[in-house]
């Protein structure tokens, strides 16, 4: 989004009834979104009692307003989710006209189906909890699987971080590109990414997962020799999947490997894996989840999705199309 676009929002938008409220999960991203739209965050008191209970109070009137709560449900996941639901409840009890939960990263998204007996579908449970808290709409980015949209009994707008990633990659003048899915489940995502990358060829890493957070790569389907391999995934958690894929691509002759993901979950030992020498030329992520300074490494590039989220918020408020942002 350009500065001119932001200025158009400031001049045309009825900001009197548009309110942005930030949780504690990613206040820097919330400030960037506020700057793009041209309004200040509503002040909020958020604290924890001695017994661990959370307390939230909205510090100004939001009666009759269109409220957008900005809160990725990242680590600590349960606290972030609970704080979001408490904020929703506080806004509804304060007579907000509509409350939209802006969730740049949706925690529990990987528990989107049963893979064994007697398991919970926690993504569906999380959606139910949010709806029960009173939220009217959800704006989520790069859900782990598309069917999660259907878990909500309210409107759920799904936006994508790929335009931000692709805009950055296009500045690098890369040649001989092949887009690689780190597993079979990510083929649709990688195919869409490859199409946006000037119809680049696609390769797939066939792997089998032996246990949670453990991945074993087996073989590459497709030609990666002497090419720039772009490994694309929705998130990087412990780094096992993406690093195993990069090692295999190097063995298969890829001249460079670039990892791209929307969500930098970065659970240990992600830092030590991703920062290893001669594995990645670059690791490109967005700021949907805040990356602590202690977890920065030489190859890491963090891109902001604030303008894209700000544009989506504006379009929801103005009842304009969001899908046209990604055509």
From Swiss-Prot:
One of its GO terms (biological process) is purine nucleotide biosynthetic process. Keywords: ATP-binding, Cytoplasm, Kinase, Magnesium, Metal-binding, Nucleotide biosynthesis, Nucleotide-binding, Transferase. Its EC number is 2.7.6.1. The keyword Flavoprotein does not apply. D-ribose 5-phosphate binds at residues 209, 233, 237-241. Mg(2+) 2 binds at residue 183. Mg(2+) 1 binds at residue 144. SUPFAM superfamilies: PRTase-like (SSF53271). It catalyses: D-ribose 5-phosphate + ATP = 5-phospho-alpha-D-ribose 1-diphosphate + AMP + H(+). It is an enzyme of class 2 (transferase). ATP binds at residues 51-53. NCBIfam families: PRK01259.1 (NF002320), PRK02812.1 (NF002758), ribP_PPkin (TIGR01251). Homohexamer. This is Ribose-phosphate pyrophosphokinase. The gene is prs.
């Amino acid at each position: 989004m350009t500065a001119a676009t932001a200025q158009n929002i400031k001049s045309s938008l009825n900001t009197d009834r548009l309110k942005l409220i930030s949780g504690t999960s990613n206040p820097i991203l919330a400030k960037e979104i506020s700057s793009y739209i041209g309004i200040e965050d509503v002040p909020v008191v958020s604290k924890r009692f001695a017994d661990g209970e959370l307390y939230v109070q909205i510090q100004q009137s939001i009666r009759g307003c269109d409220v957008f709560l900005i809160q990725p449900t990242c680590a600590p996941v349960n606290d972030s989710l609970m704080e979001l639901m408490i904020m929703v409840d506080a806004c509804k009890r304060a007579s907000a006209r509509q409350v939209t939960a802006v969730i740049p990263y949706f925690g529990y998204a990987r528990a989107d189906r049963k893979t064994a007996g007697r398991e919970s579908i926690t993504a569906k449970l999380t959606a139910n909890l949010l709806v029960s808290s009173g939220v009217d709409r959800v704006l989520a980015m790069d859900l782990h699987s598309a069917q999660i949209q259907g878990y909500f009994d309210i409107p759920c707008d799904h936006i994508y971080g790929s335009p931000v990633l692709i805009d950055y990659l296009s500045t690098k003048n890369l040649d001989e590109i092949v887009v690689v899915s780190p597993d079979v489940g990510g083929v649709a995502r990688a195919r869409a990414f490859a199409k946006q990358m000037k119809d680049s060829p696609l390769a797939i890493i066939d792997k089998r997962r032996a246990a949670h957070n453990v991945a074993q790569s087996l073989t590459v389907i497709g030609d990666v020799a002497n090419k720039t391999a772009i490994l694309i995934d929705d998130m990087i958690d412990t780094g096992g999947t993406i690093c195993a894929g990069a090692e295999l691509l190097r063995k298969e002759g890829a001249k460079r490997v670039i990892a791209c993901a929307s969500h930098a979950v970065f659970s240990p030992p992600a830092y030590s894996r991703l920062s290893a020498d001669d594995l990645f030329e670059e690791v490109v992520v967005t700021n949907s989840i805040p990356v602590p300074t202690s977890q920065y490494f030489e190859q890491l590039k963090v891109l902001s999705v604030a303008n894209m989220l700000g544009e989506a918020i504006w379009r929801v408020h103005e009842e304009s199309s969001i899908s046209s942002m990604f055509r």
